[in-house]
Curated annotation (Swiss-Prot):
Gene this chain is encoded by: mutS
Family designation: Belongs to the DNA mismatch repair MutS family.
Residues annotated as binding ATP: 627-634
Disordered: annotated segments: 834-857
Lineage: Bacteria, Pseudomonadati, Pseudomonadota, Betaproteobacteria, Burkholderiales
One Pfam family from the record: MutS_V
Protein name: DNA mismatch repair protein MutS
Species the sequence originates in: Burkholderia vietnamiensis (strain G4 / LMG 22486) (Burkholderia cepacia (strain R1808))
Gene Ontology CC annotations of this record: cytosol
One GO process term, biological-process aspect: mismatch repair
Coiled-coil regions, chain positions: none
Entries under Gene3D superfamilies matching the protein: 1.10.1420.10, 6.10.140.430, DNA repair protein MutS, domain I (3.40.1170.10), MutS, connector domain (3.30.420.110), P-loop containing nucleotide triphosphate hydrolases (3.40.50.300)
Record keywords, A-Z: ATP-binding, DNA damage, DNA repair, DNA-binding, Nucleotide-binding
UniProt-recorded Gene Ontology molecular function terms: ATP binding; ATP-dependent DNA damage sensor activity; damaged DNA binding; mismatched DNA binding
InterPro entries per UniProt: DNA_mismatch_repair_MutS, DNA_mismatch_repair_MutS-lik_N, DNA_mismatch_repair_MutS/MSH, DNA_mismatch_repair_MutS_C, DNA_mismatch_repair_MutS_clamp, DNA_mismatch_repair_MutS_core, DNA_mismatch_repair_MutS_N, DNA_mismatch_repair_MutS_sf
Amino acid sequence: MDLSDSPKGIETHTPMMQQYLRIKADHPDTLVFYRMGDFYELFFEDAEKAARLLDLTLTQRGASAGNPIKMAGVPHHAVEQYLAKLVKMGESVAICEQIGDPATSKGPVERKVVRVVTPGTLTDAALLSDKNDVYLLAMYTGHNKRGVAVNIGLAWLNLASGALRLAEIEPDQLGAALERIRPAEILTADGATDAVPAGAGAVKRVPAWHFDIASGTQRLCDQLDVAGLDGFGAHSLTSACGAAGALLLYAAATQGQQLRHVRSLKVESETEYIGLDPATRRNLELTETLRGTESPTLYSLLDTCCTTMGSRLLRHWLHHPPRASVAAQSRQQAIGALLDAPADANLDALRSALRQIADVERITGRLALLSARPRDLSSLRDTFAALPALRERISAIVANADALARVDAALAPPAECLDLLTSAIAPEPAAMVRDGGVIARGYDAELDELRDISENCGQFLIDLEARERARTGIANLRVEYNKVHGFYIEVTRGQTDKVPDDYRRRQTLKNAERYITPELKTFEDKALSAQERALARERALYDGVLQALLPFIPECQRVASALAELDVLAAFAERARTLDWVAPTFTDDIGIEIEQGRHPVVEAQVEQFIANDCRFGADRKLLLITGPNMGGKSTFMRQTALIALMAYVGSYVPAKSACFGPIDRIFTRIGAADDLAGGRSTFMVEMTEAAAILNDATPQSLVLMDEIGRGTSTFDGLALAWAIARHLLAQNGCYTLFATHYFELTQLPSEFPQAANVHLSAVEHGHGIVFLHAVNEGPANQSYGLQVAQLAGVPAPVIRAARKHLAYLEQQSAAQHTPQLDLFSAPPAAADDVECADAPAPSDATHPALDRLRDIDPDDLKPREALDLLYELRTLVRSHDADGHA
């Protein structure tokens, strides 16, 4: 059925379907959950889609306008689990509730859409991940007079917390920005040609006029209750203001109300944080492994936070390391104070207190949207009540750390808010207002009176039962209640002749009769009416409490922010103490100095980790790293980047000591993977990432290059690797860790004194190999590639053939006086000492016994096979001598 019927066409439907179709017309691209009794129903195409996505039963009931009505539904009490599934699939859902009274309605009960649930506007606890923020982002491309794109304005909002941010970026930085922000939903204008990277988030097209710059700027000012945006540094960000206007319009429309908690704005600048492109975030496994799991990552190692607010802030810090060392030093000062705290303010006691803290940030968001539930408010009350004791834990050390002093001041409990919550909300309220028992006794006299009537029913019934037994002489007479028939007096069949005349039969059972008396009927009317009136009164009072709490939203947000920061700092302190980390230092001079550094994540996975030094300075800008596969080259490079990032985030670091000069960006070119969706080969991906590094790296950038050039032929790869390394030294001048299997590159320090060779060593043991994982000065002299292949389980015949062919390649290389292109092997033997099945035969025939010996591996022989081989070799020698060979 076509849901775009004209108004005239709609009139041919039943009244209820007319109502539905009008609502659906306002939400054409959204699934409409239409409330009918205890179910949310979907109709027509929505029903078909929901049945497919949610595995619901698709039914067909009746017809409207001559068309069968396809239906699918979900029970209202389980709606959140279905919403969660749909949102995860990128779908949006309009929740249409009954707002009219069925008892007084003529025709269909009045209904309206009360909110729209979209991937980027989630606030319900059941739909949100505890440790992940959800962002709605709008993007608008600014053009010059010639129609050329000059920038992209971004505005993104965390609706659950009210955090709003703006930025303007270069068009080619969009992918990196989206990877950093990771929005769940992206708003773009109808007809816009901006290409949103695949997988960046669910894309929603909205009318282009929503992005009008003048309207957006005014809407932003109205939202923040300011006359202008100069105080936020946003007055010149016209493209971002256009995006913000569309964002606020969309977010408010989905909630059907004002966004009362969006009262602050932060403008992000490219120079504010250390640059991390998508490849770097992926390769360093900050919050997700290369396999797509959440552990083991740097985040999973660091996240010992006691609150979900702290866990979310930690994730944000890891993706936003500040360039200025001032912020890092302030955080590290706080960590030091927490570690040195006296016994009465020790770290364990503080963290124990933090575990009792609720998610104030998200509760405040729901409060602002008037969707907070009773237990949200009781959790808020209990958290505020615990703040004085929490402040006592840190009061003794605030003088030693400015960050802790700032946190302490922000944790002052909002007294009026706490008083209201304490007086209004029951100690242990029900989950939902409709269940009653939410408002505290003593808060409202009328509610208390109605409750007394309902709650005193029990005693009245006991007294009535005793009186009626005495009056009638029926010893087993009972006075009871059920929801279907209300209150009644039950008399067994054999005693009905004793029933007084004022008993009126209410229900006949097989073995008993149920009656009601005028006195019981009067009480029933009063009791049931009191219960209904009490629930209605409680609903009204609860709504009033929500309204009364709205002025305290800024104070609640202040407390939430301070609690999250304190939690992360305490987690950093716990990690530093448990894992033996140290406070790094910072300098304005060029350089990185790490003594006995360790990879934080790998160290946690192994029994013993070999620590290594890393030094950069004005005289040492590029380290050529050679050594065997599995020797630890990639681990060494990654640990250097992670230690640097941790230092600037504000954490202690896994090292004996560490000192860092300024770092503006971290780049990585690690691993091999193609981009099938983008039609790019492994080598193309490698070169694209290398190009970005060569174009953007500065003398303050840290660059990790792992085996560049391996995706093409040997000579092409070697030439590219040499040229790239040379450019990084001569042009970029950045700190570079350059791992390679091209031995020729180890000659680079002779041309550039700022380059140095280091290697990871290993030793052979029989036909095996032991990796030492220690970084030493100088180049490696062997790759141990065949030994690694043997460890990997490559069949022995393949290993033997590889050894023979390696010998041949070495012979050819020596004969042609060309450099050895293989993996750092030892100098080749003299040509006349090398034999290989694939090499041209020498002028004199080789001895057959020698050929046979070359084909065997003694380690593979059993005792009997060795004896048989000995006899075989003797036969070959005698046969060879008999043929007249010397």
